[in-house]
Amino acid sequence: MAFSYTDSLSQAGLSENIITFDDVEPVLETRNLSVAYGNNTAISNVMFQVPKNSVVSLIGPSGCGKSTLLRCFNRMNDLIPSATVKGTVKFAGQDISGPDVDPTEIRFRIGMVFQRPNPFPKSIYENVAFGPRINGMTDDLDEIVESSLRRAAVWDEV
């Protein structure tokens, strides 16, 4: 029962006029979500719900599955050949893991902000080219990457 603290609040003498999310459809939800990389299970049978218009923080020690879970929300695990994803991830009631769902559209609609920049485990070139590439810009990638790095004032550093 998510976010139902009315009993403990009323016992503490606090207002019972609070919002509960028990009857609200989640905007983002996982059911029995399991992810493995090769033979290594990263997360197992995760049940997770995010109510509409909420902000969620995932906090935990290194290696506990936070990044793996996030990669399920934006379908980045699709790009990892050894990744096996089982279970359901729904956004606005729609299963986003099906082959008929465009991962680019999902990435436009689900935003993530990290405390520290977290480049993909690829070269600088591949990290910069990733955005244009998933948006169908395959021509002139070299020029796009160089221009982007120059505008960020790091071309001479890399």
Where are these regions (language model features)?
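ABC-family P-loop ATPase nucleotide-binding domain
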Residues: 1-34
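Short coil-to-beta microelement around the adenine-binding A-loop and adjacent beta1/P-loop entry
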Residues: 27, 40-41, 104
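Conserved beta-strand
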Residues: 30-33, 41-54, 87-89
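The feature captures the beta-strand-to-loop junction immediately N-terminal to the Walker
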Residues: 59-61
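Short helical segment in ABC ATPase nucleotide-binding domains corresponding to the A-loop/adjacent helical element
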Residues: 74, 125-134, 142, 146
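Conserved catalytic motifs of ABC-family nucleotide-binding domains
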Residues: 78-81, 112, 117-126
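ABC ATPase NBD coupling module
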Residues: 82-84, 95-111, 134
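Conserved ABC ATPase "signature" region
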Residues: 88-95, 136, 140-158
